[in-house]
A protein has these predicted regions:
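Short S/T/G/P-rich N-terminal loop/turn motif that feeds into the first structured element of a domain
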Residues: 18-102, 111-247
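Bacterial Sec-dependent N-terminal signal peptides
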Residues: 1-21
Length: 247
């Protein structure tokens, strides 16, 4: 009976993951306004996001800040990113507005954030294909985009790789790993396959980028297979720092 219950829990968890939909909203915040912007988000935004989670409107929320000095200067124009997760595509399609400072605090958003210069760069919607999480608290997260030769076979190899390193995640400081496919927009110049790797500290992030940390024991044959599936490598890899998030 215990084994049956465990199997049922596993299957239900897999169903939730297979339905999860999340949105990336990149933005550029004037560096002179960054400190004030982060203070406002931590003081007002996080609580509204937590209320939205408790009310079942969203599954999770985070604000990320791009780690500077890790790439070309011109690529650092987009320096912040909102992430909002929904438990299913249906929840995303029927989403309701919840970021309302006037309703929550009696202060209109245009007044509260009026002194912050923020320029948004659209919305990018993804479907989670697989993910592993544990009780560690991530401070940094790597976002990886790629154009696979064949998306299904690439995901199959990535599935085998992730299954092989899951047991090493916690001891190597990896709090989360995931794989997702892009739903919208459908532009051909945007990479359709997306991965994330979240760690407790920057040293672990650097180790991961050198194929160490949680992935150091992955079978080299599997890594070679992945390289074959991703002939052009990573289209983009960006390291972000968590500013604020729901639990």
């Amino acid at each position: 009976m215990k084994k049956i219950l465990s199997l049922c829990f596993l299957l239900s968890s897999l169903f939730v993951v297979s339905q999860q939909t999340f949105v990336l909203n990149p933005a550029m915040v004037n560096p002179e306004d960054a400190e004030n912007f982060e203070m406002l988000i931590k003081k007002y935004g996080k609580k509204m996001a937590e209320d939205a989670v408790n009310d079942g409107l969203i599954q999770g929320w985070a604000l990320l800040k791009r780690v500077p000095g890790m790439g070309k200067v011109e690529d650092e124009k987009i320096n912040y990113l909102w992430v909002v997760a929904y438990e299913s595509p249906k929840k995303y399609v029927n989403r309701q507005s919840w970021f309302n400072t006037e309703k929550k605090y009696g202060i209109p958003g245009e007044i509260l954030f009026g002194g912050v210069d923020v320029e948004r760069y659209g919305s990018f919607v993804y479907k989670t294909e697989k993910r592993y999480d544990n009780s560690l608290k991530a401070k940094f997260i790597i976002f990886n985009w790629t154009f696979p030769k064949n998306i299904n076979s690439a995901m199959n190899v990535a599935d085998k790789i992730s299954s092989s390193f899951q047991k090493d995640m916690k001891k190597e400081g990896m709090a989360s790993w995931g794989m997702a496919t892009r739903i919208i927009p459908q532009d051909s110049d945007l990479a359709p396959l997306f991965f994330w790797d979240a760690y407790e500290n920057m040293e672990q992030v650097i180790d991961h980028l050198m194929y160490k940390a949680a992935i150091k024991n992955v079978d080299q044959n599997l890594l070679s297979q992945l390289q074959e599936e991703l002939p052009d490598g990573w289209d983009s890899r960006i390291v972000w720092e968590f500013v604020s998030s729901t639990n």
